[in-house]
């Protein structure tokens, strides 16, 4: 019954690149037994609103994308909630926790370190593994035209390289659908351009402002984050509370590659808050 659903704490799930809210298809049903689960497409992705990038790519800043999600939760009458974000969704969730401190009860981020730290600690090894961070931020329309020449190849390359050749099944077509649309492809590039410009400005201003909420980090054993960053140590710099971290036997796309562990870890973390 609807009344029973609203007795459970709300949990917002946010996806990453190059995916949509469908990346949670293996985890959301099980999590909905314990939480009121909300899954949403980030601005510009999937079936969400597409806006022009604006000056300094501000319309795709994580601040604006975080506002979208808070407005969505307000519309659903959720004044306070848990949030878990993978990849780009993790960056939006991090900004949300900073800008809307009274709304976020606890935060889980999957397979990322803070944007500021990743750029400041860029090495040759990181640049080779995450070349898209430097490709997608190039001025429009260079990356857009190159990807649009063969969007299927681009999506397959991203999914295969970052997962270690995981089989995504039919959901891969849904991810590809977005990248066949010029406006959405452009929006996804604007997301990255914002991260290298306006987002860094916001992050630098907040560098010394610590969060006061429980934070969990999950990273893939075979992913770049686990190999190149001390995730717990880095995230702990941003929090007054103990940061909990767990390595998952997975590549980058943890919710699809190891859904059982993701369900277990999210449930364990959020239910104890």
Residue ranges, per PLM feature:
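A short, glycine- and basic residue-enriched loop/turn
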Residues: 20-21, 251
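Hydrophobic residues on the short alpha-helix immediately C-terminal to a glycine-rich phosphate/catalytic loop
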Residues: 27, 96, 265-269
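Short amphipathic alpha-helix adjacent to the substrate-entry channel of hydrolases
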Residues: 22-38
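Short, small-residue-biased leader/transition segments that mark boundaries at the very start
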Residues: 1-6
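Catalytic active-site module of serine/aspartate enzymes centered on a nucleophile-bearing elbow/loop
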Residues: 242-273
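Flexible "cap/lid" subdomain of the alpha/beta-hydrolase fold that forms the substrate-access gate
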Residues: 7-10, 23, 38, 45-84, ...
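Structural cue for short, hydrophobic secondary-structure segments
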Residues: 13-16, 39
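Active-site glycine-rich loops that stabilize anionic/oxyanionic intermediates
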Residues: 8, 16-19
